[in-house]
Each structure stands twice: as structure tokens, then as C-alpha cells.
């Protein structure tokens, strides 16, 4: 069973016309090309996994007629989901309140090996991946 918010997102896809779908695919191809061009001088691009402190489930549950923090969560992941570039999300710390912080290692199309090697190197130098969050409210 889907939550009302997820059900709404799925149902909104039923209203996309074939013309709008083709336009969106063309825009996606253009954007993918722009991202590939912008990353030519780097091996990977490291970003936060989310642009805000990790919200609780309560923070992401919309009240009737209200938006939630959940919509902001996909700002970084959505870019690379759209372009099809490989990404690896790994823990890199905690907020003062104990909420987990993650970073996203993003690579060139079809270069998963570099993304995973960078992630592995980070994990060898740190121990964040071995430290589970403690005493925090339920998170998504």
C-alpha cells in the first residue's frame, strides 16, 4: 500500500502526454550532455547527499495542503538520476543532534569503477561507515 504522497506522485505520471514525454526526453538528453561537458576536467563530483539536515519521518509527512522537507531531498540525487551518471552515497558524519550526514560521489557515465574506488578509499581513511546513528528519532 502506498502513502497518499507516493500515490499522488505515481498518479501524476498518468497525465503526461506523448508529446510532453518526448520533450522531456529531449531535455534530459540535452541536460545529460551539459553535465558530461561540465565534468570533463574532474574524475568525480562530490556533493552532499541531501541539501538539508536529514529530516525525521514526521518532517516528511505532509499535512493537508502543505509541502514537506521531503521534496528538497532529491535536489542532488535527482540530477544524477536524470543524467544516468553513477553515484555512490556513503556516510560521512553526524549533525550535532546526531542525525546522519551523507556524501554522494558522482562520476562519468558508465564509470562506476572510479566512483566505487573513490568511495572505498574514503572508507579506508575514515570509519563513518562503521558508526551507526544512535538515539535519534525515526528517519527516512
Give residue ranges: language-model regions.
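Short glycine-/small-residue-rich Rossmann-like dinucleotide-binding loops
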Residues: 50
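Short, surface-exposed loop/helix-turn segments at secondary-structure junctions
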Residues: 22-23, 53-74
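Short, well-ordered beta-strand elements
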Residues: 99-108, 115-119
Amino acid at each position: 500500500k502506498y502513502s497518499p504522497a507516493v500515490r499522488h506522485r505515481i498518479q501524476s505520471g498518468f497525465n503526461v502526454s506523448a508529446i510532453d514525454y518526448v520533450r522531456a526526453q529531449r531535455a534530459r538528453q540535452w541536460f545529460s550532455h551539459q553535465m558530461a561537458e561540465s565534468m570533463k576536467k574532474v574524475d568525480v563530483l562530490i556533493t552532499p547527499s541531501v541539501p538539508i539536515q536529514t529530516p525525521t519521518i514526521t518532517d516528511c509527512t505532509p499535512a493537508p495542503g502543505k509541502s514537506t522537507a521531503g521534496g528538497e531531498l532529491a535536489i542532488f540525487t535527482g540530477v544524477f538520476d536524470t543524467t544516468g551518471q553513477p553515484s555512490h552515497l556513503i556516510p560521512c558524519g553526524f549533525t550535532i543532534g546526531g542525525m546522519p550526514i551523507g556524501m554522494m560521489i558522482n562520476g562519468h557515465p558508465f564509470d562506476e569503477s572510479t566512483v566505487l574506488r573513490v568511495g572505498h578509499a574514503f572508507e579506508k581513511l575514515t570509519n563513518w561507515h562503521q558508526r551507526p546513528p544512535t538515539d535519534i528519532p525515526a528517519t527516512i
